[in-house]
């Protein structure tokens, strides 16, 4: 099976490495020639996964046509905010009925669309068969062969079962479900809560506060998800609770790092410019806040993070507001 992987960041590279290790014919499409050279010559991604050895069968290219030629599966791992433009530019090269799997986590800020909705809109007429893979999975640990469990959402149960087998290895266990919307929203909203958790940790608020944020963040995730047609039970799984816990507590979490740096007094623009990788939660906060207002969903943590990130509010003031809201039943 030939698989075209779009996006040579840490997660795209990790999944390409995983699939190449299974014997799949994988082509990794990357815009940076230095990354292409590193993957093909040194079997390393020098920009995003420096020091980690990649499978020698993995090949990278800057040529989208080369990556897509004869591909059975398109695995999209480009940043969410770039997904629409990438799909639009590649559409003439895509065949009808192609399997498109997203491993990106976020919501488009302009149109408030999930990746699945963007695929449906941009590839209309090509009848793409869509799936999304998500869950608690730091890229470096996947490349290192550490045990990882994720979930693959696909409305077509049979296709979901096939893709589950494609992605599974002895160290990368893939479950499947049919709630595509729930899997996508869990992977997006958890990044907003992770920034809040990092901010809380950085301000020295302790373990109690972090646990409270994770738990109430899960409630917000489910509240918005159900309003948008997802199943509440999905958020108790790997793409919801699992990814939320990892992203709020793990030191490799980019979104948690944003919160920590905000707490240290750094400005948001400087943080984003200095990270070298995309922290999806910054843009996703804006999108989730807008979705909540549109759907009439009460998301107080998201509202507070929007005020901090986009209105310049003092984090300590927002914590005070969260803690002194009207009391209610859980």
UniProtKB/Swiss-Prot annotation:
UniProt keyword Lipid metabolism present: yes
Major localisation: cytoplasm
Swiss-Prot/TrEMBL keywords: Cytoplasm, Lipid biosynthesis, Lipid metabolism, NAD, NADP, Nucleotide-binding, Oxidoreductase, Phospholipid biosynthesis, Phospholipid metabolism
Binding-site positions, sn-glycerol 3-phosphate: 105, 135, 137, 190, 243, 253-255
Subcellular location: Cytoplasm
Pathway annotation: Membrane lipid metabolism; glycerophospholipid metabolism
Record family assignment: Belongs to the NAD-dependent glycerol-3-phosphate dehydrogenase family.
Enzyme class: oxidoreductase
UniProt GO MF annotations: glycerol-3-phosphate dehydrogenase [NAD(P)+] activity; NAD binding
InterPro entries: 6-PGluconate_DH-like_C_sf (IPR008927), 6PGD_dom2 (IPR013328), G3P_DH_NAD-dep (IPR006168), G3P_DH_NAD-dep_C (IPR006109), G3P_DH_NAD-dep_N (IPR011128), NAD(P)-bd_dom_sf (IPR036291)
Binding site for NADPH: 10-11, 31, 105, 139, 254, 278, 280
The protein's Enzyme Commission number: 1.1.1.94
Catalytic residues as annotated in Swiss-Prot or TrEMBL: 190 (proton acceptor)
Catalytic activity: sn-glycerol 3-phosphate + NAD(+) = dihydroxyacetone phosphate + NADH + H(+); sn-glycerol 3-phosphate + NADP(+) = dihydroxyacetone phosphate + NADPH + H(+)
Name recorded for this polypeptide: Glycerol-3-phosphate dehydrogenase [NAD(P)+]
GO terms under biological process: carbohydrate metabolic process; glycerol-3-phosphate biosynthetic process; glycerol-3-phosphate catabolic process; glycerophospholipid metabolic process; phospholipid biosynthetic process
The protein's role, per its UniProt record: Catalyzes the reduction of the glycolytic intermediate dihydroxyacetone phosphate (DHAP) to sn-glycerol 3-phosphate (G3P), the key precursor for phospholipid synthesis.
PROSITE patterns reported in the protein's UniProt record: NAD_G3PDH
Cellular compartments per GO CC: cytosol
Pfam (any one): NAD_Gly3P_dh_N
């Amino acid at each position: 099976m030939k698989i075209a992987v779009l996006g040579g960041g840490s997660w795209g590279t990790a999944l390409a490495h995983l699939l190449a290790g299974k014997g799949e014919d994988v082509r990794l499409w990357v815009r940076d020639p230095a990354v292409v050279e590193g993957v093909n010559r040194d079997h390393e991604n020098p920009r995003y996964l420096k020091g980690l050895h990649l499978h020698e069968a993995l090949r990278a290219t800057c040529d989208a046509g080369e990556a897509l030629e004869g591909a059975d599966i398109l695995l999209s791992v480009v940043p969410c905010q770039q997904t629409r433009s990438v799909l639009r530019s590649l559409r003439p090269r895509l065949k009808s009925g192609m399997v498109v799997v997203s491993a990106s986590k976020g919501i488009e800020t302009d149109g408030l669309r999930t990746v699945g909705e963007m695929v449906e809109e941009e590839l209309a007429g090509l009848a793409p068969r869509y799936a999304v893979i998500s869950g608690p999975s730091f890229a470096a640990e996947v490349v290192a062969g550490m045990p990882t469990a994720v979930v693959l959402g696909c409305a077509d149960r049979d296709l979901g079962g096939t893709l589950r087998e494609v992605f599974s290895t002895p160290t990368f266990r893939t479950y499947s479900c049919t709630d595509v919307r729930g899997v996508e929203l869990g992977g997006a909203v958890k990044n907003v809560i992770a920034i809040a958790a990092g901010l809380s940790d950085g301000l020295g608020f302790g373990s109690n506060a972090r646990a409270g944020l994770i738990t109430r963040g899960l409630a917000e995730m489910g509240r918005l998800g159900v309003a948008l047609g997802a199943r509440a039970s999905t958020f108790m799984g790997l793409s919801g609770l699992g990814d939320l816990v990892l992203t709020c507590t793990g030191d490799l979490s980019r979104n948690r790092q944003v919160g920590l740096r905000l707490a240290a007094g750094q400005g948001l623009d400087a943080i984003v410019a200095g990270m070298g990788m995309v922290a999806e939660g910054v843009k996703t906060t804006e999108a989730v806040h807008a979705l909540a207002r549109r759907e009439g969903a009460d998301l107080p943590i998201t509202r507070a993070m929007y005020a901090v990130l986009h209105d310049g509010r003092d984090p300590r003031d927002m914590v005070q507001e969260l803690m002194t809201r009207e009391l209610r039943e859980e």
